[in-house]
Amino acid sequence: MITPLTQRPAWKALEAHYQTIKGMHLRQLFADDPKRGERFTAEAVGLYLDYSKNRITDETLHLLVQLAEECGLRERIEAMFRGDAINVTEQRAVLHIALRAPRNEKILVDGNDVVPGVHAVLDRMADFSDKIRSGDWQGHTGKRIRNIINIGIGGSDLGPVMAYEALRHYSLHNLSFRFISNVDGTDFVEATRGLDPEETLFIICSKTFTTTETLANAHTARRWMLRQIKDLEGVRKHFVAVSTNAEEVARFGIDTANMFEFWDWVGGRYSMDSAIGLSTMIAVGPENFREMLAGFHAMDQHFYSAPFDRNLPVLMGLLSLWYNNFFGAQTLAVLPYEQYLKRFPAYLQQLTMESNGKHITLNGSQVDYQTSPIVWGEPGTNGQHSFYQLIHQGTRLIPCDFIGFCQTLNPLGDHHDLLMANLFAQTEALAFGKTEDEVKAEGVPDWLCPHRSFEGNRPTNTILAERLTPHTLGALVALYEQSVFTQGTIWQIDSFDQWGVELGKVLAHRIGQELEDENGKSLKHDSSTNALIQRYNRLKQK
């Protein structure tokens, strides 16, 4: 029997500790400890984490680490790396860590070493990518492939899109990359607008090859291609698949020789470094892709071996939990001061909320505490001119992760210094604010002072790296992956299933059939849903 989280000694100690610390201000914490900005830092795999601007003391950190230990975080990390079936509800191993393991490592699933299979797929991906990049792979009519379109949804889209945007600086610029995920026909129409089918390759990404949205778009892609090529066999040169289901891939009409596999022990939201990343490898090349994998692996090893109080993913996970469960914070803002990371917050939304958006524990009981925060964000400095006002002076506590780089990939005058000056200024302003006395000293009228003062005491992490490289990106993604794992372990939930996604799929399939009944006589929903369907059926005919 698992001891309920809220009954653990460290949890109770943290509840008491929160009462003593909740009124402390970061101004005082920094004044009392001139070296706080040096002490509350950690560094690994090229990432420097400054967590000094958090509402914590040494005692807070000690108790949070104690909580992680009491909740069996060390044992669960070891279980994941061993290949145990820690995805309890689906009885599967969770081994995205094997996707980036070096060739000489050995990781067993049901007694079988999976690492050779991983590298066999990576080698096939590299061979295929080189053929596309060099022009050796040609379409049915002999034209060179110039357009790559990835069709997928969820983890089969968010990871590839994020990685492509993040590593666009390293991409081959004579190839265009587009991504289709939404079943809304507009997504397909706009993604294919202006493209020559004879120069276009579709990568169909679906673990089961039965995902409704992906298959709908894949069939539309095939029809789009056939209008130009008019030869079903010829179309084969324009489609490849990433899937675990060879039978369905063949049924669709893709040669299974052009199927790149991955495995049931890879969850969709953890799959960007598997064959799902084929579009990424084509864009940046096999060498850069392997550098990204090396960054993932290095962070995995740090997570596995570093003491919890110096362990970047553990520290970030514990800090997020601290605000979520004790301060009542409900969201986390991720704010990359790097335009190439513009899709990173959206990627983290799925990673975090699909993993830890759960209310049932591993032993089947309902939680009596908050689980996953809502993750959101935009690149700096854009966000400063939209939602930062709420973070500074609103009524909600919103912890923030700031991400920045010391070197820009695109030197342009003093742009990068301006960008980073804003990052540093925001973390300082959020922490220390501006008192009414400071505002008055500037000659501001008394009536206006409350409006122009800032409470501060808003917690932030700052992650700094030298520059955005494939290796850095891999380390950064793995950092958040393992932070999510840390939180899910402490909350005693299964971070690797997603049953909430399934119910909507079932209902959508049923309603899809009902939309074909224009009279609506077969509707058996609630009065609201029935009325909406009837109105839709009536108006779509106009």
Swiss-Prot record:
SUPFAM superfamilies: SIS domain. It is found in: Cytoplasm. GO terms for biological process: gluconeogenesis; glucose 6-phosphate metabolic process; glycolytic process. GO terms for cellular component: cytosol. Pfam families: PGI (PF00342). Its EC number is 5.3.1.9. The active site is at E354, H385, K505. Pathway: Carbohydrate biosynthesis; gluconeogenesis; Carbohydrate degradation; glycolysis; D-glyceraldehyde 3-phosphate and glycerone phosphate from D-glucose: step 2/4. It comes from the Bacteria. One of its GO terms (molecular function) is glucose-6-phosphate isomerase activity. PROSITE patterns: P_GLUCOSE_ISOMERASE_1 (PS00765), P_GLUCOSE_ISOMERASE_2 (PS00174), P_GLUCOSE_ISOMERASE_3 (PS51463). InterPro entries: G6P_Isomerase, G6P_Isomerase_C, Phosphoglucose_isomerase_CS, SIS_dom_sf, SIS_PGI_1, SIS_PGI_2. It is an enzyme of class 5 (isomerase). Gene3D superfamilies: 1.10.1390.10, Glucose-6-phosphate isomerase like protein, domain 1 (3.40.50.10490). The keyword Cell wall biogenesis/degradation does not apply. It catalyses: alpha-D-glucose 6-phosphate = beta-D-fructose 6-phosphate. Keywords: Cytoplasm, Gluconeogenesis, Glycolysis, Isomerase. Catalyzes the reversible isomerization of glucose-6-phosphate to fructose-6-phosphate. Belongs to the GPI family. This is Glucose-6-phosphate isomerase. It comes from Nitrosospira multiformis (strain ATCC 25196 / NCIMB 11849 / C 71).
